[in-house]
From Swiss-Prot:
This is Exodeoxyribonuclease 7 small subunit. The lineage of its organism: Bacteria, Bacillati, Bacillota, Clostridia, Eubacteriales. One of its GO terms (cellular component) is exodeoxyribonuclease VII complex. One of its GO terms (molecular function) is exodeoxyribonuclease VII activity. Its main location: cytoplasm. It is found in: Cytoplasm. InterPro entries: Exonuc_VII_S (IPR003761), Exonuc_VII_ssu_sf (IPR037004). Keywords: Cytoplasm, Exonuclease, Hydrolase, Nuclease. HAMAP family: Exonuc_7_S (MF_00337). It is an enzyme of class 3 (hydrolase).
Length: 73
């Protein structure tokens, strides 16, 4: 059975939790290394999610470069 993809937001929350744990003074070197490795994996997943979103946007926009017009209110 296919695994459901995690959202970018849920990956970000996990990464923030890891960062907070690594910033604590109570974590061991081994724990820091484990968290660092997990953080790198999360960053790679997040990068992939962003790349997929960018590809979908390009398809929807017909690969046309358009200038963003924001709302300056």
């Amino acid at each position: 059975m296919a695994r459901k993809k995690e959202s970018y937001e849920s990956l970000m929350i996990k990464l923030q939790d890891i960062i907070e744990e690594m910033e604590s003074e109570e974590i061991s070197l081994e724990g820091s290394m484990k968290n660092y490795e997990e953080g790198i994996k999360l960053c790679n997943k997040m990068y992939k999610v962003l790349n997929e979103a960018e590809a979908k946007i390009k398809i929807l926009d017909g690969n046309e470069e358009k200038e963003f017009v924001g709302n300056d209110n």
